[in-house]
């Protein structure tokens, strides 16, 4: 009934309902029915860091229901969001729109820019992973970094799917995850043959060798990334916008770590931090004091 009335006064009350998985799909459909007049409201909610992540990550799902150039443009704008989880949601929604309507106006230059950004983000994560200490309990951080690198790789392939045939690119992505060396090699060869040089260099530099140091060397040449030490790498994570990586980095800080990192633990206990960061910092501070 609300959907039929299209009374925009309900929009403000409906947006918070997106966080409930039971009703998220229905709420998305209702909000989509309001059409372009409310697009700016939805974008504002997406970029509002004061809103719950569970709400923000459902916003792109509204636009994927509306096959229009305006929807594509809004989702393109959302890819500027620094939070990788939210960027993923925007890219995934664009994939859905392209699957439904390939003739929509996708800004290819902007997709190229984001392909480059995601590739650089991968190598930054790799550079941080490569300098992790082995004498402290940091397994959870190393695992988290690897997971984030895998997620970045998926975003890269989803972006590539906006430039090329989505099914072909998805098949190549799945092949890369195969346990068979031959299947993975075939995927690398396919990417090399299908993609233009300007795009494939950002992906091939990641997938064409399993050796992490060799991979990092290629990334450093490609993006002019400089080597960093352990302390600098940790500070980048602790000052970053990825809550999970911040928490994992905090957890790995032992009593033997540099004073600058101990100070970050103290800072992270304050109430103005996300609950996960605050709780982890409180635990680590107590653990290190008892060490």
Describe the role of every protein-language-model region.
Residues 5-18, 36-48, 68-80, 99-114, ...:
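Amphipathic alpha-helical scaffolding segments comprising HEAT/armadillo-like alpha-solenoid repeats
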